[in-house]
């Protein structure tokens, strides 16, 4: 190889020599070799000519382009004489200026194929002529294995590329020599310096093969030329046959492989020409070389651009097949429904248009959204925001998608409650899926707009889109979507819901297409129960229902008094083998119904999964530090439990897990379960057509009955609405009328709606004058519906009035930009207080009160305890719901330390005032009721942080534990808002560090050692205690845990839950590691405005 390499290097510098034509290789026979009377010569030449003509019509083989010199005279790259017979096949009607791009020149030009071209035909003719010589027929079949592989021939051959031909030649002094066996030709020292590098390597292969003919095994050799890599070649079998032992065996071999041996010559030449095509050809023009290099780079860049812009990564809706496998592995989904396939292949989806789709509950809407999100994350390489209505659903979705993030390489980030970073971490490699509540989603979008990163958000998915018409939360959702539509032309919006009616308004607002289907994986049958008769809902019937059956359950007089609605009869038809939900009007009614049903169930129900139900009770006691709700203690042994907001988060999660696994078979619940986590049932019973004291709405009814029927488990779903005769007409209207229309609440929710919107528009500089703000409002959902919603005032008047209010409140200032006799135009800019309010997402009704409280707190902030800080972060909107127990208030007040009593004194609440209220005495001095009530709630929170036992605090203050849980969650969220509020005001610098720690304490409200475990989504206090006791004391422990070991170690932990916990821990660990790594790289990166960098670039220029 070294020798070959040196020859290749030599040939570049040595002068080129003239070489003879093709015939000299196999040489026409000399005078001594010719046989007189060879009459077939002319006929054979005609046959060869016909063979050359037959090659027309075969498509040329695609090969790598050959670089040519600047002038047509340089077509012969190797130098030397050109055979005119070969050049006549080359195109000559093209001038220099008409030449195609060099990168597209086919080295074989007009020839149809290098497997059967005229050059090969010439070689074939010469071989046939040689074989027809009588004295050479004996050795004809030996030609390929002996002469072609001999050292002398190897050294005599050289290959010259001529335009799009390849000519095989010999030196002039061997022109009249023939390739007889036994004739020795002494090789010259420099016979290969004109051979291209790949050919030199090729003949080196031949030499080595001929030396190894006696070996019994075949050898493969990989060669690399000095200029490029060549493909691994395996030498033809004909060149490495074993030596012939005797004449007989030799004869047999020759006879059986005549055709193979003849073809081997072609094979050798084909390989040689292919190698020559890949060999780097010397370039004599430096400008031409530079041009070709630039062209090659442009082609490579274009290829990479095409590859990177391709959104098709695989066969599963442009996603890798691994995604399909993960759905089968994690969720048991083997195949999509027909409607899901249709929806995913809609033109509007393919063209990235906005889309609204609506299907009944349990129809599989979420799966379509997830596939679209994965397409955006993996194919389009952009971030995704998913907006969900409740914290519990956010956490459920985080747990479900973390496994996909680990496997497919993207982050899943939680934005709910007090969790979420603003602005979000900017990832350079992996993309992020933000899963957020409505409020946190709005803050996230504001943050992205402010930092100029809104276009990094490729897709926004909104679940339960109908909530856009529900109060202040609907107004917040509308603001979020309107800002995205106005500021980003590349962000796609997907909205889904089971209950939509006036879709046209939403389509106009979102500029979206609409897709709907009535598909349900399980058939749903609706029934009405009046007295002991059950009717089936039938839209074709005259009165909307038809008789179905009579209840045949035997009721005693006692049972009839206790259960006038026949609930026991209805549930015992289903449980315990199937699940059942009973929706009740109020929380108290849920508990009463659960206890009543258990009183009349037979003892046989106690035996059904008895061991598992004992485990549930045991775990509930562990969660409550030995405390257990007496109602649950009586109902769980029968497989029955209540489900409402009075449960703590840990209790609710544990009961939901038990229901999902079939340990519990009956839930008595409020309407909030219908819109919360997915807990379907075989039968759904509506205890009454009321939610609290309000009559049921069509949307609420559809959501409740939509829980009936579990895909993959039940073959049918049933809903039964129990009603009294007096409600019959209203119920018939309820089941037949269309869904309620969805209306904007942007103006109705004044301080949480339109004013908050205007403040953020000006603060984010989306619109800063009256005309721009009015134009923005016309594009909102309210703008679409203004003709219906506005009766007394116009949109312009409302806009002017709102801006005036914000200016008077000190949140905005206006600057005159144009003034004339007829009109004055203003530009608005946000004040420091206004910026703090919109950055902290503070309700504008309370922003000035909050500012005053924080300002007053600076005058005498008491830091000996957390009580003063807790008071400052207790939500204002919960104060009006508080009705203190004055005796408890007085008892707690009297137990305060002097420093804590000092906090009350600073706030203006004295012990004497509380004592008089407790004893019922008249109060002479007027005290602010809101301050008194807020301090009472602060006592509750302060006690909870000290004791961390919600049951103990519940007993001390005589409050439902669920209320205390909600108070804690709301305070943690508001504390986060106050922190962002203070970050915008320099005067409140002291609160920043203090509120960070307080927010963390309020969020977890556990001992410090449990906080790292509770950072993992789905791990609440009870589970954190179990994990800590089992030795899992850090995030790293959980991230590296084995799910199977967790199942065996932790009580009442399913395999699915264990996998989700481990996946969530891994995701959180990766996020933290990635953030630290990016921070390090950012610190080490040279600043773009570094003076030395500018000087360096100037010097290079």
Curated annotation (Swiss-Prot):
Cited CDD domains: DEXHc_POLQ-like (cd18026), SF2_C_Ski2 (cd18795)
Keyword field contains Nucleotide-binding: yes
PROSITE patterns, alphabetized: HELICASE_ATP_BIND_1, HELICASE_CTER
Domain of life of the native organism: Eukaryota
Mechanisms controlling activity: ATPase activity is strongly stimulated by single-stranded DNA. Presence of ATP and Mg cofactor are required for helicase activity allowing to unwind duplex oligonucleotides up to 60-70-mer. This helicase activity is stimulated by replication protein A (RPA/RP-A) complex that binds to unwound regions and inhibits re-annealing.
InterPro entries reported in the protein's UniProt record: DEAD/DEAH_box_helicase_dom (IPR011545), Hel308_SKI2-like (IPR050474), Helicase_ATP-bd (IPR014001), Helicase_C-like (IPR001650), HTH_61 (IPR046931), P-loop_NTPase (IPR027417), POLQ-like_helical (IPR048960), WH_DNA-bd_sf (IPR036390)
Signal peptide: none
Outcome of mutating residue 365 to M: Abolishes ATPase and DNA helicase activity
Domain Helicase ATP-binding: 346-518
Cited SUPFAM superfamilies: P-loop containing nucleoside triphosphate hydrolases, Sec63 N-terminal domain-like, Winged helix' DNA-binding domain
Polar residues composition-biased segments: 241-258
EC numbers: 5.6.2.4
Transmembrane segments annotated in the record for this chain: none
Function: Single-stranded 3'-5' DNA helicase that plays a key role in homology-driven double-strand break (DSB) repair. Involved in different DSB repair mechanisms that are guided by annealing of extensive stretches of complementary bases at break ends, such as microhomology-mediated end-joining (MMEJ), single-strand annealing (SSA) or synthesis-dependent strand annealing (SDSA). Possesses both DNA unwinding and annealing activities. Forms a complex with RAD51, stimulating HELQ DNA helicase activity and ability to unwing DNA. Efficiently unwinds substrates containing 3' overhangs or a D-loop.
Record protein name field: Helicase POLQ-like
Species this chain originates from: Homo sapiens
